Amino acid sequence: MKKIILFGDSIFNGFRNGQDTDLVTNLFQKGLKDYAQVENISKSGATTVEALDYLHLIPQKSDLVVVEYGNNDAATGWGIRPERYEQNLNEILTKIGKAIVIGLCYPDPTNSEINQFYGDKRLDLFNDVAKKVAAKHSVQFVDILPAFRKLTDISTYYQKDGQHLTNKGNEFLVNQILPAIKKELD
């Protein structure tokens, strides 16, 4: 059985009520059924700066690492410069082997509290950096930002904080990524 590692931030941790959950991990496992074992080593609140410190947690015998970092990096209140994000993501992909890079997740555009830290230009900038780095390393890039932007009744996909996803949002997220994982492992 193949082994998939989820390596990201609170989006991959199914963050809810102030704590991590197995919601996203379970959705990936359900979608991959008996095809692959899913292990989640994501760290809520982490940027690519912390991700570099967590690289040693990735099991040596993994078949694919799904990298989902960028939203915390892009935040103006606690993030990093785009150049540093690019440098860190390059280093991560150089060290982990076979991977898929997930683009940035769109915060709820109706939530002014969370959006004070983002904005479309900044999200697009960091998303483009992730896309560029993925191309440089010849790894698949899953651009989820446009899919989230097209949602109707978008607030139903988010918790009250405007950043973390509801059950509906988590299902949507995982359904955007599963085809890429299956393609990579076939």
Regions inferred by a protein language model and the residue ranges of each:
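Alpha-helical cap/lid subdomain in secreted, periplasmic
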Residues: 52-186
